[in-house]
Amino acid sequence: MISAGDLRKGTTFELDGQVYTVIDFLHVKPGKGAAFVRTKLRNVISGGVTETTFNPTAKLQEAVIERKEMQYLYSDGELYYFMDQETFEQIPLNFEQVENAIKFLKENMFAIIKFYKGAAFSVEAPNFVELQIVECEPGIKGNTATNAMKPAKLETGAVVNVPLFVNEGETIRVDTRTGDYMERV
């Protein structure tokens, strides 16, 4: 059992016979009255999103989630194909299942696929990835004095903010959990 006060992004639990993953949460402590936890939940099976409020002391049944590392192979435009490294079985996933991770995944990279009762429902990119910048404004000499940022498009299509001194064609390390630039490689 998990307490509603312990809910965090990515926590998966069962509620009313359905399995939900926390997308967003907020602990609210009003000046008058009892505290509560406001959550935005995604149904693991249907993909539907709902907002629910919990008492922080409410107990929820934690769902048993299997995590498996798989290799991202390719996309045919609609589906994204991942391969199990042990059985070489390929599984297709739709955009809703991969939307958070796919912007940081190149072909042949490894990712964590989450399964509930044998059905894949979510993809987690590695915490840090190294990607090349394919489009950004050129850096100008002397732009290292401030911590100003500029948008840069990566080879996967993701757009991240990078310091002014980073140029097109360079490879950078990105934190996939936040989408933030970490360093040049």
From Swiss-Prot:
It holds the Pfam family EFP. It is found in: Cytoplasm. Its main location: cytoplasm. Keywords: Cytoplasm, Elongation factor, Protein biosynthesis. NCBIfam families: efp (TIGR00038), PRK00529.1 (NF001810). Belongs to the elongation factor P family. This is Elongation factor P. It comes from Clostridium novyi (strain NT). The gene is efp.
